[in-house]
């Protein structure tokens, strides 16, 4: 089966085109399934929304309605699933579980971009020290252990701006992530950047 489950929309601020553009491209490329998994709009108490990372929470109903309308429109040509890409933010896991159930989502993926939140937390794509790698791995494994996620997205995110070839710390982190995924029966995505 040819499938992609990591598809963002223009609502997140770093994707372009319409939702339907993605569906038509997937059909043209012979995909059997397309999963939309825009970045989840966390309900931060202060209302913070990162302008180039995720949609505002007020956009969530329209996002879900759009994807579901496309699933109906293209039924028989491609199967379309509805989900979100999410970080492991312990303070929001209860909200995430409730939101998934209330909205009948098909899946969630673990895209472990930030430590704690995206307003004040460290962005794991800027990792440069062994301590930061350790935080990334610990957070990713804890997220996987919740059982809430279908797979681990771009597990090599910590290498994005690492600035040097994979060293002993990076190799140890990669091995630990692979071992955790195997132990938890968690698929890993291969998708980050053309430089790797």
Regions found by a protein language model. Give the residues of each.
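A generic local structural motif
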Residues: 22, 94-97, 138-139
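Domain-core and long-helix interface of multi-subunit machines
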Residues: 13, 105, 109-196
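Hydrophobic alpha-helical segments and helix pairs
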Residues: 78-125
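An N-terminally biased module of ancient metal coordination in phosphate/nucleic-acid-related enzymes
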Residues: 1-86, 90, 100, 159-162, ...
């Amino acid at each position: 089966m040819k499938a992609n489950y990591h598809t963002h929309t223009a609502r997140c601020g770093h994707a372009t085109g319409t939702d339907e553009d993605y569906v038509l491209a997937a059909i043209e490329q012979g995909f059997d399934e397309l999963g939309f998994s825009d970045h989840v709009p966390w309900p931060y108490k202060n209302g913070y929304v990162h302008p180039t990372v995720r949609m505002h929470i007020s956009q969530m109903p329209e996002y879900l309605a759009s994807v579901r309308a496309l699933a109906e429109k293209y039924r028989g040509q491609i199967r379309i699933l509805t989900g979100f890409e999410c970080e492991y933010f312990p303070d929001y896991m209860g909200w995430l579980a409730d939101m998934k159930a209330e909205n009948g989502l098909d899946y969630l993926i673990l895209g472990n971009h930030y430590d704690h939140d995206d307003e004040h937390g460290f962005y794991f794509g800027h990792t440069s020290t062994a301590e930061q790698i350790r935080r990334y791995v610990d957070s990713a494994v804890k997220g996987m252990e919740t059982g809430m996620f279908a797979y681990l997205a771009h597990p090599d995110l910590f290498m994005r701006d690492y600035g040097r070839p994979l060293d002993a710390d990076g190799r140890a982190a990669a091995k630990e992530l692979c071992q955790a995924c195997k132990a938890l029966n968690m698929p890993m995505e291969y998708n980050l950047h053309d430089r790797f």
